[in-house]
UniProtKB/Swiss-Prot annotation:
<feature type="binding site">
    <location>
        <position position="111"/>
    </location>
    <ligand>
        <name>substrate</name>
    </ligand>
</feature>
<keyword id="KW-0255">Endonuclease</keyword>
<dbReference type="InterPro" id="IPR036816">
    <property type="entry name" value="RNaseA-like_dom_sf"/>
</dbReference>
<feature type="disulfide bond">
    <location>
        <begin position="51"/>
        <end position="110"/>
    </location>
</feature>
<comment type="similarity">
    <text>Belongs to the pancreatic ribonuclease family.</text>
</comment>
<keyword id="KW-0732">Signal</keyword>
<keyword id="KW-0540">Nuclease</keyword>
<dbReference type="InterPro" id="IPR023411">
    <property type="entry name" value="RNaseA_AS"/>
</dbReference>
<keyword id="KW-0378">Hydrolase</keyword>
<dbReference type="Pfam" id="PF00074">
    <property type="entry name" value="RnaseA"/>
</dbReference>
<dbReference type="GO" id="GO:0016829">
    <property type="term" value="F:lyase activity"/>
</dbReference>
<comment type="function">
    <text>Endonuclease that catalyzes the cleavage of RNA on the 3' side of pyrimidine nucleotides. Acts on single-stranded and double-stranded RNA.</text>
</comment>
<dbReference type="InterPro" id="IPR001427">
    <property type="entry name" value="RNaseA"/>
</dbReference>
<feature type="binding site">
    <location>
        <position position="35"/>
    </location>
    <ligand>
        <name>substrate</name>
    </ligand>
</feature>
<dbReference type="GO" id="GO:0004522">
    <property type="term" value="F:ribonuclease A activity"/>
</dbReference>
<dbReference type="GO" id="GO:0005576">
    <property type="term" value="C:extracellular region"/>
</dbReference>
<feature type="binding site">
    <location>
        <position position="91"/>
    </location>
    <ligand>
        <name>substrate</name>
    </ligand>
</feature>
Length: 150
């Protein structure tokens, strides 16, 4: 009887690990980058509800409120071309896969308001033009992470 219970528990453990493991060490992808940061069809505007709408629409308020996010109002070709700029070290690690834009880009920064709590995620919307630093991976190189706005 003890051996049978052990086998059942082991089988459940293998099943759960097989289900959870792929998301644990998941590398950032170009699809994630596009979903979280690209909004080429719109120009920066002063609508104060832009961030609230976009953060929800792009799935960044499911389960918790993402604290900060940046939307890029440029073409994918222009953003991808940044990957051909000079390499630099990533701000958040020692990886040297980052590249800085040669010119400022039109962006919208979304910041969670201090009093805001899940599930009512409320953001401030700030439009500006800034250089960005992105991490690029693959062959050809494509953006996978927005590292900084400078």
């Amino acid at each position: 009887m003890g051996l049978e219970k052990s086998f059942i528990l082991f089988s459940l453990l293998v099943l759960v690990l097989g289900w959870v493991q792929p998301s644990l060490g998941r590398k950032p992808s170009v699809q994630d980058f596009k979903r979280q940061h690209m909004d080429p069809g719109s120009s920066p505007n002063s609508r104060p509800t832009y961030c609230n709408q976009m953060m929800k629409r792009r799935g960044m308020t499911k389960g918790s409120c993402k604290r900060v996010n940046t939307f890029l109002h440029e073409s994918w070709a222009k953003v991808q071309a940044i990957c051909s700029q000079r390499q630099m070290t990533r701000k958040t690690s020692s990886k040297k896969n980052c590249h800085k834009s040669s010119s400022p880009l039109h962006i919208t920064e979304c910041r969670l308001k201090g009093s805001s709590k899940y599930p009512k995620c409320d953001y401030t919307t700030t439009n500006s033009q800034k250089h960005i630093i992105i991490a690029c991976e693959g062959n050809p190189l494509v953006p996978v992470h927005l590292d900084a706005r400078v």
